[in-house]
Amino acid sequence: MKKTVAVIGSRGAIGNAVVDTLLADESVEAVFKFSRAENTEHEDKVKHIFIDIEDEESIKQATESLPEDTKFDLIFVATGILHDEKNVFPEKSIKDISFDKLIKVLTINTIGPTLVGKYFIPYLRKDSKSTFAFLSARVGSLSLIHI
Protein backbone atom coordinates (compact mmCIF):
# COMPACT_ATOMS: atom_id res chain seq x y z
CA MET A 1 0.00 0.00 0.00
CA LYS A 2 1.30 3.46 -0.92
CA LYS A 3 1.98 5.85 1.97
CA THR A 4 0.67 9.33 2.68
CA VAL A 5 2.89 11.53 4.84
CA ALA A 6 2.80 14.97 6.44
CA VAL A 7 5.85 17.10 7.19
CA ILE A 8 5.21 20.06 9.48
CA GLY A 9 8.03 22.60 9.24
CA SER A 10 8.90 21.58 5.70
CA ARG A 11 10.81 24.80 4.88
CA GLY A 12 13.51 24.31 7.51
CA ALA A 13 16.69 22.36 6.84
CA ILE A 14 15.52 19.21 8.62
CA GLY A 15 11.99 19.30 7.22
CA ASN A 16 13.19 19.98 3.68
CA ALA A 17 15.65 17.07 3.85
CA VAL A 18 12.89 14.77 5.10
CA VAL A 19 10.63 15.87 2.22
CA ASP A 20 13.41 15.21 -0.32
CA THR A 21 13.97 11.74 1.14
CA LEU A 22 10.25 10.94 1.09
CA LEU A 23 9.85 12.14 -2.49
CA ALA A 24 12.60 9.73 -3.57
CA ASP A 25 10.81 6.82 -1.85
CA GLU A 26 8.65 4.91 -4.35
CA SER A 27 6.38 3.66 -1.56
CA VAL A 28 5.27 7.25 -0.83
CA GLU A 29 2.22 8.33 -2.81
CA ALA A 30 1.62 11.81 -1.34
CA VAL A 31 3.58 14.31 0.75
CA PHE A 32 1.71 17.09 2.50
CA LYS A 33 4.13 19.94 3.24
CA PHE A 34 3.06 22.30 6.02
CA SER A 35 4.87 25.62 6.51
CA ARG A 36 4.37 29.37 6.72
CA ALA A 37 5.32 29.65 3.06
CA GLU A 38 2.45 30.95 0.95
CA ASN A 39 3.05 28.32 -1.72
CA THR A 40 -0.11 27.18 -3.46
CA GLU A 41 1.68 25.27 -6.22
CA HIS A 42 1.24 21.52 -6.11
CA GLU A 43 3.40 18.91 -7.76
CA ASP A 44 2.40 15.32 -8.52
CA LYS A 45 3.16 13.92 -5.08
CA VAL A 46 3.26 17.20 -3.11
CA LYS A 47 0.52 19.31 -1.54
CA HIS A 48 1.44 22.59 0.20
CA ILE A 49 -0.66 23.76 3.15
CA PHE A 50 -0.12 26.89 5.23
CA ILE A 51 0.48 26.49 8.97
CA ASP A 52 1.78 28.85 11.63
CA ILE A 53 3.11 26.79 14.52
CA GLU A 54 2.67 29.80 16.83
CA ASP A 55 -1.08 30.03 16.21
CA GLU A 56 -3.44 27.27 17.41
CA GLU A 57 -6.20 28.39 15.05
CA SER A 58 -3.79 28.08 12.11
CA ILE A 59 -2.89 24.54 13.17
CA LYS A 60 -6.58 23.64 13.39
CA GLN A 61 -7.30 25.25 10.00
CA ALA A 62 -4.44 23.30 8.42
CA THR A 63 -6.14 20.03 9.34
CA GLU A 64 -9.53 21.34 8.24
CA SER A 65 -8.10 22.04 4.78
CA LEU A 66 -7.13 18.38 4.29
CA PRO A 67 -9.21 16.24 1.95
CA GLU A 68 -11.90 14.52 4.01
CA ASP A 69 -10.54 10.97 3.63
CA THR A 70 -6.90 11.84 4.44
CA LYS A 71 -5.10 9.36 6.68
CA PHE A 72 -1.37 9.64 7.31
CA ASP A 73 1.10 6.79 7.66
CA LEU A 74 3.67 9.27 8.97
CA ILE A 75 3.37 12.71 10.53
CA PHE A 76 6.81 14.25 10.95
CA VAL A 77 7.17 17.47 12.97
CA ALA A 78 10.42 19.31 12.22
CA THR A 79 9.82 22.70 13.79
CA GLY A 80 12.25 24.44 16.08
CA ILE A 81 14.08 27.67 16.79
CA LEU A 82 17.42 28.55 18.32
CA HIS A 83 17.53 32.08 16.90
CA ASP A 84 15.75 34.27 14.40
CA GLU A 85 16.65 37.31 12.33
CA LYS A 86 15.34 39.77 14.92
CA ASN A 87 15.34 39.24 18.67
CA VAL A 88 15.86 35.59 19.55
CA PHE A 89 19.41 34.31 19.91
CA PRO A 90 21.25 31.79 22.09
CA GLU A 91 21.59 33.24 25.58
CA LYS A 92 25.19 33.46 26.73
CA SER A 93 24.25 35.05 30.04
CA ILE A 94 21.26 35.10 32.38
CA LYS A 95 20.99 38.79 31.47
CA ASP A 96 20.11 37.81 27.88
CA ILE A 97 16.91 36.06 28.96
CA SER A 98 13.59 37.84 28.58
CA PHE A 99 9.97 36.82 28.96
CA ASP A 100 9.16 37.48 25.29
CA LYS A 101 12.14 35.46 24.03
CA LEU A 102 11.30 32.54 26.32
CA ILE A 103 7.66 32.55 25.22
CA LYS A 104 8.68 32.55 21.54
CA VAL A 105 11.16 29.67 21.99
CA LEU A 106 8.75 27.62 24.12
CA THR A 107 5.90 28.22 21.70
CA ILE A 108 7.86 27.08 18.65
CA ASN A 109 9.83 24.26 20.28
CA THR A 110 7.26 22.84 22.72
CA ILE A 111 3.75 24.27 22.70
CA GLY A 112 3.30 24.37 18.92
CA PRO A 113 4.40 20.77 18.32
CA THR A 114 2.14 19.62 21.17
CA LEU A 115 -0.81 21.39 19.54
CA VAL A 116 0.13 19.77 16.23
CA GLY A 117 -0.32 16.46 18.03
CA LYS A 118 -3.73 17.53 19.32
CA TYR A 119 -5.05 18.29 15.84
CA PHE A 120 -3.07 15.87 13.64
CA ILE A 121 -3.11 12.60 15.61
CA PRO A 122 -6.76 11.94 14.63
CA TYR A 123 -5.51 11.86 11.01
CA LEU A 124 -3.13 8.94 11.63
CA ARG A 125 -4.03 5.73 9.84
CA LYS A 126 -5.62 3.28 12.26
CA ASP A 127 -5.88 0.20 10.01
CA SER A 128 -2.09 -0.26 9.83
CA LYS A 129 1.07 0.93 11.54
CA SER A 130 1.44 4.70 11.58
CA THR A 131 4.03 6.99 13.15
CA PHE A 132 3.96 10.44 14.73
CA ALA A 133 7.52 11.76 15.07
CA PHE A 134 9.19 14.92 16.35
CA LEU A 135 12.74 15.94 15.51
CA SER A 136 14.54 19.15 16.29
CA ALA A 137 18.06 20.46 15.92
CA ARG A 138 20.68 20.37 18.64
CA VAL A 139 19.23 23.38 20.41
CA GLY A 140 20.86 22.55 23.75
CA SER A 141 24.39 22.33 22.40
CA LEU A 142 26.92 24.51 24.19
CA SER A 143 29.03 24.59 21.03
CA LEU A 144 26.32 26.63 19.32
CA ILE A 145 26.52 29.48 21.81
CA HIS A 146 30.32 29.63 21.90
CA ILE A 147 30.76 29.48 25.67
Regions found by a protein language model. Give the residues of each.
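Conserved glycine-rich Rossmann-like NAD(P)H-binding loop of the short-chain dehydrogenase/reductase
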Residues: 23, 27-41
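Rossmann-fold cofactor-recognition segment
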Residues: 44-57
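N-terminal Rossmann NAD(P)H-binding glycine-rich loop of SDR-like oxidoreductase domains
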Residues: 10-23
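Amphipathic alpha-helical dimer-interface segment in Rossmann-like NAD(P)H-dependent oxidoreductases
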Residues: 19, 107-128
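Conserved NAD(P)H cofactor-binding loop of Rossmann-fold oxidoreductase domains
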Residues: 76-90
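Active-site loop of short-chain dehydrogenase/reductase
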Residues: 71-72, 124-138
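Catalytic Tyr-X3-Lys loop
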Residues: 93-114
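Conserved small/polar residues in nucleotide/adenosyl-binding loops
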Residues: 145-147
